[in-house]
């Protein structure tokens, strides 16, 4: 059955195994390989009901028709397994170890480049192509093409407007021009999506920062965030590097969501590890904190991939997150990771007793 509420979300992020970036994954999309990888996930995790699927506006710009055809075909793959989808429209997480690609800050900051020469950049989502800057036109064409054709698509549970925006110290500075510009752009994406008649809820995949969550809440319908308990985390981030801080952070975000009357999804969670048992231990601890609070989740991530954080060392640069994937390149499940099924809907009642 399709997922019906944020608290019921049980699943994974998905990036195809064959690419090193969003552009690479989508420009060289492999429908057959995707079919195999999603089927593997459903075999290992029968109650998997939601996939957070990363898109690429850069790939769309290079071949719009092919991108849209692959997007629709991919939705069909997920639907054939009873999996609802949260497409991620844009990305602002830029990893220096193995950059996924996405939106650079100079594309959303007024006058920061030749393509953003406007004092009122992203001021009005309803303006036509002849009245806007090049970047507004390009982003608008992408959002229009992707959302308009699926505005009422029951295969889509929600639209994630952007992955991890506001991911810098400036987010806590009310006077920051960067912060103001980024929030304005995010609001523009939300407005554009609603103007297209999207019937699905809107959300934003915020990293673990309460200010970012508070800034993006007014123009989203579901609060999404990325609660990672980081066993290898830095002391400068105690809300992720310590269990005490992690619990306090979850309680703070849960209280905020309740205050606003909105559902809550951890649409990225479970920090990685090269060691299988360490990864399983982190998974068990993290999900044991999320489930009692009624927080749905899409763990990062389902399958080994060449993109950042999802591959073994021999496949490319590996950062602090080490290995976050559940399924190996040969299709086998990492040892002990079947424990993810203990957190499925059918198991939650017994766990609560």
Describe every region a protein language model picked out.
Residues 57-59, 270-274:
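Short histidine/acidic/glycine/proline-rich micro-motifs that form metal-
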Residues 275-289, 309-317:
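Histidine/acidic-residue-rich catalytic or RNA/ligand-binding cores of hydrolases
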Residues 290-298, 330, 338-353:
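Catalytic domains of carbohydrate-active enzymes that cleave complex glycans
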């Amino acid at each position: 059955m399709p997922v019906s509420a944020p608290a019921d979300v049980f699943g994974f992020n998905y990036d195809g195994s064959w690419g090193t970036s969003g552009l690479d994954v989508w420009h060289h999309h492999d429908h057959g390989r995707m079919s195999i990888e999603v089927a593997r996930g459903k075999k290992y995790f029968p109650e998997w009901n939601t996939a957070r699927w990363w898109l690429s506006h850069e790939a769309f710009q290079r071949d719009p028709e092919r991108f849209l055809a692959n997007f629709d075909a991919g939705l069909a793959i997920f639907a054939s397994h009873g999996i609802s989808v949260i497409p991620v429209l844009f990305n602002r997480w830029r990893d220096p170890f193995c950059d996924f690609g996405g939106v650079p800050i100079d594309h959303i900051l007024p006058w920061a480049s030749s393509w953003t020469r406007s004092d009122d950049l992203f001021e009005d989502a309803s303006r036509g192509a002849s009245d806007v800057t090049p970047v507004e036109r390009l982003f608008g064409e992408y959002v229009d093409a992707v959302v308009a054709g699926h505005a009422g698509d029951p295969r889509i549970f929600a639209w994630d407007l952007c992955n991890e925006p506001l991911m810098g110290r400036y987010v806590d500075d009310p006077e920051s021009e960067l912060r103001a510009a980024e929030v304005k752009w995010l609001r523009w994406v939300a407005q554009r999506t609603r103007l297209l008649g999207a019937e699905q809820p809107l959300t934003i995949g915020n990293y673990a920062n309460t200010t970012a969550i508070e800034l993006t809440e007014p123009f989203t319908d579901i609060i999404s965030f990325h609660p990672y308990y980081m066993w290898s985390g830095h002391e400068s981030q105690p809300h992720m590097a310590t269990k005490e801080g992690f619990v306090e952070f979850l309680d703070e975000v849960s209280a905020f969501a309740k205050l606003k009357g909105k559902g809550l999804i951890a649409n990225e969670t479970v920090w990685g590890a090269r060691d299988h048992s360490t990864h399983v231990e982190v998974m068990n601890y993290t999900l044991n904190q999320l489930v009692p609070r009624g927080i749905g989740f899409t763990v990062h991530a389902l399958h080994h991939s060449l993109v950042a954080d999802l591959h073994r060392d021999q496949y490319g640069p590996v950062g602090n997150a080490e290995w976050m994937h559940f399924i190996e390149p040969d299709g086998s499940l990492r040892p002990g990771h079947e424990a993810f099924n203990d957190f499925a809907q059918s198991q939650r009642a017994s766990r609560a007793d």
